[in-house]
Amino acid sequence: MVRKGRRKEFGKFTKKIAAVGLALAMTVSTAIPTYAYYGFSGEFTRSERLTQTRVTSIFSENELGVVNFETTWGDKKANIASMDEYIEEADKKGVKVLVFPEMCVTGYVSSSDPTSTEYKWAVESAETKDGETASHFAKIADEDDMWIIYGATETIEKDGKIDKNHAYNSAFVCSPDGDVTTYQKITPVEGSWCTSGDTPVIVDAGEYGKLGISICYDTYSTPELERYYSAMGCNILINPTATGGGWSQSNMSAWEEYYKVRLESIASRDGFLILSSDLVGMNETPSNPSKFPGGSIIMNAVFNGPSYLAGADDDSNIITNQEGLLTNSKSVRASTGSTCSNEDFNPELYVDLYSELADKMEENGGVLRYSANTTASTKGPKAAVVNMTGYWGNKTKTIAKMKEYIEEAGKKGVDILVFPETVLTGYGYLQPSQDPFYQKFGVSMQVYTAETIPGTTTNELSKYAKKYNMYIIFGMTEKDEAGTIKDNGVEKVYNSAAILYPDGRIDSYQKIHRAGQENKWSVTGKTPKIIETKWGKIGVDICRDGHFYPELGRYYAAMGCTMFIHPTATTGNAWYRSTRIGSYVDRDGMAAITCNLLGGDGIYVADGAYTYSPDDIDENGDFVGGSAIPETIYNQNEIEDDPYWNSKNWLGTGGVFNSTSFIATKGSTASTALKPRINYNGTGAYSEGFEERGNTSPLGLEIADMDLTGTGFGGTESTFKPALYAKLYDKLATLYRGGYVSKIKDKDNSGTTPETTIPETTTAKDSATKTTEPKNTENKKVATTTVTVNKTLVKKATKVKASAKTKIYVKKVVGAAKYQVQVSATKNFKKVLATKTSTKATFTIKNSKLKNKKVLYVRVKVAKKVNNKLVYSKWSASKKVVINKK
């Protein structure tokens, strides 16, 4: 019995981080966990979780638009004229939010040669946000009462100077009030002409929600940005993009895989409605012309699959090589996702992880680049996953079953064997009134059956790891070796992965992000786990860690892991599994071994009689009650109406697990190779008989020879910015974790350390949603400030001609910072025709927006600044307005 180092106190130390793209240097004073956390006992505590902002918007058919746009390279005038035509078309269809592609005004440029025509054009064509082009589109946005977002190169004056040798790749956001906000691409891959931005931009679009702005590579390869947007309450992700131009037209299937895996995993994980607008057709640069595929989409996704509202066929295949405006085909609800407001979302930890990566990157000269240890004879390990469930509360029977699979794997030369999450004891949680362990011992089954690691079971199975020179990883519940852990007076344990080494060492990883009812019996771990092997480093996480929290996987990849191991217990289908876990393979260069429970889990009651009691726990502490589980278990659908696969016959939160495990490696990354980007090695959804089994993996072992060629993370100062990410997570922790003290301080030129400076979020319009009144929910301990409003604020509209505009005058309110007016065709405002925000008490609305209604209803609210924040009043009483047309 050998175990990795005992508990170590994490000493505090000061770290210097290179501020990438930021004007000020940063220092971080923090405790970075280096070793697994052990020796903890007593009361489990952590910072208070404060309420986070969430919004919901509902869009009718055709209110959202994206454009497959073909540029005339180097001709801004022609491109602007073409954009005007699309805007007019969108306005006629009733579009409220319209997105054009990246660099659509100029044509796409990728160059690091300052003498080239392309490089010079990118810089010379750049304009400020109040330049001629932005002013042109801002005026149209105001007239059409539409959000217009487009891509162009931008120049920004800093310290009274303009850089004449570089420019930004920016998204210009024009509001319905004629305001312009710009976002500068944070991770540009366009060459040295392009300066990196360093500030996320959140646009408060009023009734349409909160828009997070991201450009192309920012979206596909920077999950940290999307996480920040989601945590800050965004419900829509805007993605002007120029993707696919470097791919061979003969290999569009690989580009589509890249595009779909990246976007669908984001939408499903973070809850966004995504508007992605891509270039289409030829981009005729002088030296390197390329053809873009289009593929603009409007899409959201849930637990079981994507929903394409534009840009894809009925089977969710991306439609390519078609120019034109696309709008949402049906009404859609856009709501802020819940993952980044979950109690286990852990920005405090992420600050530490990314700060450590920033140090490492600085030490390596601004680069983090890795590859696996492969040779001509050994491309990687022979890996196996075990598709099974344990016997609920009966470790004796489960261990016997596990040994059979270990023996089989050993005889087949397996190097790494992975079992599912909590396989040793079973996953399902039962309420105390149903749990026989609770009734007999006063604790849940998961707590009673937990062991220390090393402990009885790990010591026993470690012998097999040594015998077969094999790594064995399996899920179990873990006690703290120092004593009992209490959470609000309830005894709890860790949800852990036991790690058995070929040399006899025993270690474990404790799950950091829990799922479902796991908080009833477990506490969160605190420390990542990296295994050193002859093939390279391997990171370990469990279920929700990998499915919902990319921060841990990104840490592993950037620390040099070329593989990660992922025991899980999920009912998510094959699409959910492949997009979530496949994204690490494709984006971060880590091969994946992910093993899911397969079969029934919980107390089996196939005969319909819940005949079990505390007396069904034998002298060994094993549960032996319930219906008898068949000695031979068949694959799903192998026997008609098999009661074993009926979830109604299982008690507990587990039920029936019938999804997939798989072993995934990098496929082809070459743009011309006709191969998939992710190779599932004949496992999971690519296993023989997958559809016949009802889209599940086969019971038992799935084995694959892993080829680690092409694995490994690659990040440069332009494409991976851990110092910035640490700063963003620090802001989130400061906002939403009670008692958290910022770990990041900016230094001014004098060397003093003032209050933390956070990249500012740009707001172009003040918040409201279609379904709820805006509330100050940033901190539940702060009372909402009320601004009163006069019910007679709305004056009569002017008499106008049918073809003209309607002017609405509002009585001025002393101290008002902004006014917002809404016009509706109905008194209950269920049919809102227009919403306008202004600092002035006068509003102008095109009659076309008012649907030529003769009778309208108008209401207003005002905002005052309270503690530097805009706080809105409630809506005034509505006023009926009759428009007399001349």
Where are these predicted regions, by residue range?
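Extracellular fibronectin type III
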Residues: 867-885
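Active-site catalytic loop in hydrolytic enzyme cores
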Residues: 126, 139, 155-265, 320-327, ...
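Conserved aromatic anchor
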Residues: 804-815
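CN hydrolase (nitrilase-like) catalytic-core segments centered on the catalytic cysteine
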Residues: 126-147, 220-319, 323-326, 451-471, ...
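Ser/Thr/Gly/Pro-rich low-complexity, disordered linker/stalk segments of secreted
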Residues: 746-787
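Beta-strand-rich modules
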Residues: 850-868
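Cys-nucleophile CN-hydrolase/nitrilase-fold catalytic domain and related Cys-dependent amidase chemistry
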Residues: 76, 85-176, 244-265, 269-272, ...
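Sec-dependent signal peptide cleavage junction
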Residues: 28-43
